[in-house]
Amino acid sequence: MKFVDEAVIRVEAGDGGSGCVSFRREKYVPDGGPDGGDGGDGGSVFLQADENFNTLIEFRFERFHMAERGENGRGRDCTGHSGKDLILKVPVGTRAVDHDTEEVLGDLTTHGQKLLVAKGGFHGLGNTRFKSSTNRAPRQKTLGTPGEVRSLKLELLLLADVGLLGMPNAGKSTFIRAVSRATPKVADYPFTTLVPNLGVVNPRPGQSFVIADIPGLIEGAADGAGLGIRFLKHLERCRILLHIIDIEPIDGTDPVESARAIVGELEKYSPKLASKPRWLVFNKTDLLLEEELQQKVDRIVKEMGWEGDVYTISAYNRDGTNELALKLLDYIASLPPEDNEIDPDSEVEFKWDNYHQANLDSVNEDYVDEDDDDDFDDDDYDVEVIYQR
C-alpha cells in the first residue's frame, strides 16, 4: 500500500436538536401544562489510534466527515435522540493540527487512544424548561447550537527509538538491513529510499528497539532541494539519532562538509530536533586500510569539533553493526520512560450546566402572568424562539 503521511480533511460535528413547544392534551384535560421536550445533543468527531493502520491514504480520497445531528424534542416530554459520534481510525503516531490556526490539537501515540477534534452542538430546550410560578404557559424554546466545524491536517509521525540521518548513499538502508529484518531498497545511486522505513532490532533475546530510516538529506533541503525536509518530522519522536557518514564517498566529496551540511539542515528545521542525543557512525570502513581509516576518522572528528560518541562500521560486511546495536539497546534502556500523559488543559471545555441559564433567567424575570395555565387559549399566542450564538 502507498505510504501517505499527510492529509487534510474537514470534520463537522452534528448540530444540536431544537427544543419543542407542546402542551399536554388528554381526555378531560383540554388545557394542560407544557410538555415540550429538549432536543438531543449533536454527535462529536473523534480520532482513534489503531495499530492496524500504517498510512493516511484513505483520507486522501475521503476528505469530508460529518457526525449525526441531534433529533428535535417532541411532546409528552420526549427528549430527542443524541446524534451518533463519528470515530475516525488513524495510525498510531498521528498528529492532528488545525489547518487554519496551526494549533496542535494532540498526538495519538498509543493504540486505542482517542482525541476529540470537533464538539457536537448542545441541545435546545423545550418549553417545559421555562415553566415557573409566574410563567404557567411558556411558549419559549431554544434552538440547538451548531456543531463545531474544523479543517484538520493529519500528520503521521513514525514511532521509533532510533533515527538515521545522513547524505544520500551514506549506507543508511544497508545498515537497517544489517541489524533488522527490514528490506528497504538498496542501490548505488542517490535517493534510493523515497519513503521512511522501520525495522525492529533484537540484539538480545526478549529485548528490542525500533529504528527508522528516512530519505537522505542534501545541502539546501530546508529550501526544498532534493526531497526537502518533509521526512525529518519522522525523527521528532526518536530518542537518539545516528548520523551516518560515508567515510569514502564515491563522488569525492569531503565528509566534513557533508556532515556539517546535515547538521545545518537539522538546525534550520528544528533546534529541538538538533539538540537530541546524536552519535556519529562512520560507514563503509571496508574501503580503507585500518591505519588509514583511523587517521581519517580522527581528522574528521577534529575538524567537526565533535565531542560525542563515535563508531565505525561496515554495514555491507556487517562489521561492528551488532556491537553498535547492543550499545544502542543499553543506552535506550538507561533512559527514563517517556511521559505520554495527556495534558488536561488541552481538552475541549464546554459549559454544559449553565449554557442556557441566561435565557432561562431572563425569561423568568421579564415574563409575569397571574393566570392559571388551565384558562389559556393556544391560538392567542405565538411561539417565541430564543436564538443562541
Swiss-Prot record:
Query: What would be one Pfam family of this protein?
Result: GTP1_OBG
Regions crossing the membrane: none
What is known about its subunit structure? Monomer.
Q: What does this protein do?
A: An essential GTPase which binds GTP, GDP and possibly (p)ppGpp with moderate affinity, with high nucleotide exchange rates and a fairly low GTP hydrolysis rate. Plays a role in control of the cell cycle, stress response, ribosome biogenesis and in those bacteria that undergo differentiation, in morphogenesis control.
Question: What EC numbers are recorded for this enzyme?
Answer: 3.6.5.-
GO terms for MF: GTP binding; GTPase activity; magnesium ion binding
Q: Where is the Obg domain?
A: 1-159
Entries under PROSITE patterns matching the protein:
G_OBG (PS51710), GTP1_OBG (PS00905), OBG (PS51883)
Question: What protein name does the entry list?
Answer: GTPase Obg
| Name of the coding gene | obg
Alphabetical GO biological process terms: ribosome biogenesis
An example Gene Ontology cellular component term from the record?
Answer: cytoplasm
Which cofactor names does the annotation list? Mg(2+)
